[in-house]
Curated annotation (Swiss-Prot):
This is Orotidine 5'-phosphate decarboxylase. Gene3D superfamilies: Aldolase class I (3.20.20.70). It holds the Pfam family OMPdecase. Keywords: Decarboxylase, Lyase, Pyrimidine biosynthesis.
Amino acid sequence: MSSITLQSYASRAAKQPNPAAKALLECMERKQTNLCVSIDVTNKQDLLDVCEAVGRNVCLVKTHIDIVEDFDMDLVHQLTQLSEKHDFLIFEDRKFADIGNTVSLQYSAGVHKIASWSHITNAHLVPGPSVISGLAKVGQPLGRGLLLLAEMSSEGALTKGDYTQACVDEAHKDTTGFVCGFIAMSRVDERERANTHRDLLILTPGVGLDVKGDGLGQQYRTPDQVIRESGCDVIIVGRGIYGALTTEEGKADKKAAFAKVSEQGERYKTAGWDAYLKRIGQK
């Protein structure tokens, strides 16, 4: 069997057992994009407007829903409508990290009711495998997917070594099929288990075309480094795309800022897809 990195998204989708991961791979192939935009804004309308601006260029929109100061269920309704209109999936970056019973409640209930609208979410393995079973109890019947945080892009992150190995091991032990991949900086599944035949997605943050860091510990690599060199599947880009909204000029002229957001979305989509085509030998 050839390395997963040499297979097309379409061929991988055909063999993918997790419904959310299958839908994501199909979307990536259909739209010719491996771009996920991380929208870390604190205003409901800005979140929706960024989705509108980047929707045609992305396969996935990543939210931190708990930072939205004027959150209501209408936001969820409109976000879901935009995902259908522009054909992308939603990833709530919740980073669950508690015992099974607690995370199942955090996932299904509370103010945000994440499981009802987010196709994919993620978790730290620090509490042990019960974090997987607790979330699977809620998410698997809904066809959702879970990513384990095997590695992080911030300087000094402790997600390495034995911890990363444990994430890979638990993903392969998961009999529910709910775990569908990792947040990681490289192809950790093949690196840690050379003979694995299970296809687990690798979504990678810390991607930028113009800067190498942010002064707060974030470290950036290019789409080519992430997709072609490291063999990852999805690039996660945040401020490199929506950053125009945070400048004084952007705050003063939002129309121009959102035009820039759209332009950057197109730029990263092209860079990510070109890197993928080179990886599988089609360019």
